[in-house]
């Protein structure tokens, strides 16, 4: 994390997660330069995912460092589960939870503090609710349940029909030399792989929802445009097209191209305009 980013964290009074001594030392030096003391942080522990976080053999050095730094206040300790959504991952998840409880208790004892502890992600909340501790981290669960249907949809990806064409059998459509195998009525929608509507959805793999019905893609997904087969309908330019949302479940959409909802949501590009609705 750059110095500018860390200063932004301080300016906006955010709480950083710290995962190694280099990062901690860098952040502490900035606090010293600004004359700030008791700034709250959350410490991340590596309990088995082996991505970010302090390892067990680093805890003593970490605690020694923290005891010598009045600029830092350890407000929370957390870790991240690697396989909480997988039935076969139960042993690993339990091992991670036990390791986290051991290491966080050790830290609290050495530092003589009481912290906010958290390890459960969305799947962890669903499958290991007896380990909620002091807080949980509902990430993808804000948008979709990882397994269970939720009562409301927080996010939808919406576009509208930009143009309608009647294409004859044998005509070309979009990029490539493939020809249409039958007469079709085609809706062109202004969304493509540059927006996050992946090329894998092309040629009938993807389905969109328009006015109470599902319609398949046809042809290749372009960078900025896609084609939908709307034959035998009375749809019009401007009609609302749901890529995923209340009527087109994102888990099913993701499964159709052998991926997960996380990837679809995180793939939506910055050029897609976000509209925030308040109930």
Which functions belong to the PLM regions below?
Residues 1-116:
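Active-site-proximal beta-alpha core segment in soluble small-molecule metabolic enzymes
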Residues 1-4, 20-25, 94-279:
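Active-site anion/phosphate-binding pocket segments in diverse small-molecule metabolic enzymes
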């Amino acid at each position: 994390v750059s110095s500018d980013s860390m200063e932004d964290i301080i300016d906006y009074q955010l709480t950083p997660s710290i995962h190694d001594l280099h990062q901690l030392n860098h952040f502490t030096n900035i606090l010293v330069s600004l004359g700030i003391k008791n700034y709250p942080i959350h410490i991340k522990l590596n309990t088995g995912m082996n991505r970010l976080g302090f390892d067990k053999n680093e805890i003593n050095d970490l605690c020694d460092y923290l005891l010598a730094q009045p600029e830092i206040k350890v407000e929370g300790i957390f870790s991240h589960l690697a396989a909480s959504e997988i039935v076969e991952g139960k042993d690993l998840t339990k091992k991670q939870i036990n390791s986290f409880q051991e290491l966080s208790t050790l830290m609290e004892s050495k530092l003589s503090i009481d912290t906010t502890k958290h390890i459960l992600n969305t799947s962890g909340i669903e499958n290991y609710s007896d380990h909620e501790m002091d807080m949980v981290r509902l990430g993808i669960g804000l948008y979709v349940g990882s397994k269970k249907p939720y009562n409301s949809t927080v996010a939808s990806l919406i576009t509208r029909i930009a143009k309608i064409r009647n294409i004859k059998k044998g005509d070309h459509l979009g990029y490539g030399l493939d020809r249409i195998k039958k007469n079709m009525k085609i809706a062109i929608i202004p969304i493509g792989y540059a927006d996050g509507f992946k090329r894998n959805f092309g040629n009938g793999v993807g389905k969109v929802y328009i006015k109470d019905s599902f319609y398949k893609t046809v042809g290749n997904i372009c960078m900025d445009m896609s084609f939908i087969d709307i034959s035998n309908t009375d749809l019009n330019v401007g009609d609302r097209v749901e890529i995923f949302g209340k009527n087109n479940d994102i888990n099913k959409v993701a499964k159709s191209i052998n991926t997960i909802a996380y990837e679809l949501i995180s793939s939506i590009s910055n050029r897609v305009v976000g509209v925030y609705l308040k109930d």
